[in-house]
């Protein structure tokens, strides 16, 4: 069988065979850690989706995190529906696609949860939903989460993962920063505990508001934590910044984070903090 044509090029038959073989290989068969560049066989990764080399936690959905984080959970405000107040081109289609992919009505899951004998209110931002962007329904759900916790004297745990305010909703998206912060202040005034867990990525308006307002601020290893992105900083300052400038470990070193916790330890750490660091209900 002739492999090459006269001009020393692969025959069309072999090119087509290569394309057919490539099409049979799943896109998610291999994963590359964005931090240490280690190539991982996806099927060998555990339920926590962490890199065995550097501990980086890959971006996961809210439902994936729920599966190993809590013993039980009941969702809240699932009927709220995101609108398109500015008639932004293509936004409705993007929303529908994100809702189908994530199974959520917007970029955050909220509800009442339990770990062991500790009851608390839980919020998990989902980076698979338009990169966890902060929209009006996201802000409304988190606000209601804190209001419910204040009313029922419960601590709140919030996992942040966001690219910032959602541009398709304009100023109404930015308003959520102040609205959520007000609900947090009322929760704090009631003497209740608020724990934040920063995951990759936590940036923009979320970092500038409720992500940094916790009584205890935890972070996952190697998580990106910052306000503006690396490229924006470098273009604005005309200075090349260190590769690890916005890594959680560096943010911890400068005092903005209290502790870094692996996903494997999050459940026990949160239970301990809420049991001994928060107001107890009789």
UniProtKB/Swiss-Prot annotation:
EC number: 2.1.3.15
ZnF (C4-type) intervals: 33-54
Domain CoA carboxyltransferase N-terminal: 29-282
Any single biological process term in GO: malonyl-CoA biosynthetic process
UniProt-annotated location(s): Cytoplasm
Highest taxon of the lineage: Bacteria
Binding positions (Zn(2+)): 33, 36, 51, 54
Main localization, broad class: cytoplasm
InterPro entries attached to this UniProt entry: AcCoA_carboxyl_beta, Acetyl_CoA_COase_Trfase_b_su, ClpP/crotonase-like_dom_sf, COA_CT_N
Role description: Component of the acetyl coenzyme A carboxylase (ACC) complex. Biotin carboxylase (BC) catalyzes the carboxylation of biotin on its carrier protein (BCCP) and then the CO(2) group is transferred by the transcarboxylase to acetyl-CoA to form malonyl-CoA.
Subunit description: Acetyl-CoA carboxylase is a heterohexamer composed of biotin carboxyl carrier protein (AccB), biotin carboxylase (AccC) and two subunits each of ACCase subunit alpha (AccA) and ACCase subunit beta (AccD).
Protein name: Acetyl-coenzyme A carboxylase carboxyl transferase subunit beta
Organism field: Limosilactobacillus fermentum (strain NBRC 3956 / LMG 18251) (Lactobacillus fermentum)
Gene that encodes it: accD
